[in-house]
Amino acid sequence: MSKPIEIEIRRAPVLGSSMAYRETGAQDAPVVLFLHGNPTSSHIWRNILPLVSPVAHCIAPDLIGFGQSGKPDIAYRFFDHVRYLDAFIEQRGVTSAYLVAQDWGTALAFHLAARRPDFVRGLAFMEFIRPMPTWQDFHHTEVAEEQDHAEAARAVFRKFRTPGEGEAMILEANAFVERVLPGGIVRKLGDEEMAPYRTPFPTPESRRPVLAFPRELPIAGEPADVYEALQSAHAALAASSYPKLLFTGEPGALVSPEFAERFAASLTRCALIRLGAGLHYLQEDHADAIGRSVAGWIAGIEAVRPQLAA
């Protein structure tokens, strides 16, 4: 992959801490917020931002506790991330935006869109979080050859959620960064590409934000508050009319192509793009396709927006 255009990391004061972010594109263009998941950072958008910036004002924050953002003494629950992201958006003066999200970034995007539907110009998303009634819905697959891999993923995440085991695996062994992340990418990342993913988490204590997220996954009704919030957010998503773009990989991880097809068909104004071979961190395998598709999608929406307003 070609060396990305370097985009300067900036920092904003947020709730007594700071959040780092990448920003590029024309200031007067429509804003696009890029929201990453666990255990990544805005680094995952590095090859996508330059492709979208010709048509948009791109802002990609590092979630609190991740990347180069601060690590305040908080629990790093989903609702902590909601508070910090809300404050970041207010601090940056963003009043409307396209949302581009993956993994936990999608949960934040869905929750934001449910609370502030007028804020959302459009939503592009992939490998998304949703309320999962049973453990079989986590890493669900309809392909027989994928069943063993899916069951192994469930077993690992059950351990992450188990007191003591999760701490040993994520805080001590750094398993999420060293195993889950590369295991969710088809190509092999070199040390130079992995370094920005490793640097934020040098010690067990620094990895607490990474441990918190798998324990927040809304599975079988737990945790109850997150499960309920995402049920409401998904109901709002199903009722929404803003444009949507769903990317899916083959075989995917949280989202199989078959599930993605049904999900897109159930929504209003949702296009589906099949990227080909991909697991969970689709941005690392398909940056070019994602970037060009998002840019074209935004340009198309903005071209007709003045006509709709007339």
Curated annotation (Swiss-Prot):
Top-rank EC class of the record's enzyme: hydrolase
Annotated EC: 3.8.1.5
Top-rank taxon, per record: Bacteria
Keyword check for Hydrolase: yes
Keyword Hydrolase: yes
Gene3D superfamilies for the chain: alpha/beta hydrolase
Function: Catalyzes hydrolytic cleavage of carbon-halogen bonds in halogenated aliphatic compounds, leading to the formation of the corresponding primary alcohols, halide ions and protons.
Record protein name field: Haloalkane dehalogenase
Organism of provenance: Bradyrhizobium diazoefficiens (strain JCM 10833 / BCRC 13528 / IAM 13628 / NBRC 14792 / USDA 110)
Species lineage: Bacteria, Pseudomonadati, Pseudomonadota, Alphaproteobacteria, Hyphomicrobiales
